């Protein structure tokens, strides 16, 4: 994992709608919860995504945004989003370029580790958690990020 206090590397990846999305774009309204997960439609990843979905209102109220990254295609992400009514961006990193940049590749480069970063608008990593099999730790991490951000700057209104 990347160290807390370090700068989050800039990237651009296609989202579930095949639109290129950069880290800078994701940060335009406030801090970002960037989470990495192994695969769409697996039991653990579905549980994690749905727990984030269920926190969407609180996340947005705190001025945060969310994006998930995994090596599946935009089409897979679109189906996953639609089936589970996810309201956040899913980014496709088929070549695992960003996964490697953020140092969350699995052992010997296989797979993806379950990791979540809180990145501020200046691209500094404010906090992070790595918990491959303890999905509840990611939900607790997000709840803590929401609580910490709730008193801070609110999301800029969209037009």
Language-model region placement:
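Chalcogenol-based redox active-site neighborhoods
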Residues: 1-159
């Amino acid at each position: 994992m990347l160290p807390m206090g370090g700068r989050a590397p800039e990237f651009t990846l296609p989202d579930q709608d095949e639109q290129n999305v950069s880290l800078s774009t994701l940060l335009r309204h406030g801090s970002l919860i960037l989470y990495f997960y192994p695969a769409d439609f697996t039991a653990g990843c579905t549980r994690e995504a749905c727990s984030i979905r269920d926190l969407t209102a609180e996340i947005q109220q705190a001025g945060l945004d969310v994006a998930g990254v995994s090596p599946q295609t935009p089409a897979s992400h679109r189906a996953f989003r639609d089936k589970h009514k996810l309201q956040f961006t899913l980014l496709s990193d088929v070549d695992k370029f960003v996964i490697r940049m953020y140092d969350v590749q699995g052992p010997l480069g296989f797979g993806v580790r379950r990791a979540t970063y809180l990145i501020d608008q200046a691209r500094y990593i404010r906090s992070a958690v790595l918990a491959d099999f303890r999905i509840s730790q990611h939900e607790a991490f997000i709840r803590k990020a929401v609580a910490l951000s709730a008193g801070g700057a609110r999301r800029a209104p969209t037009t």
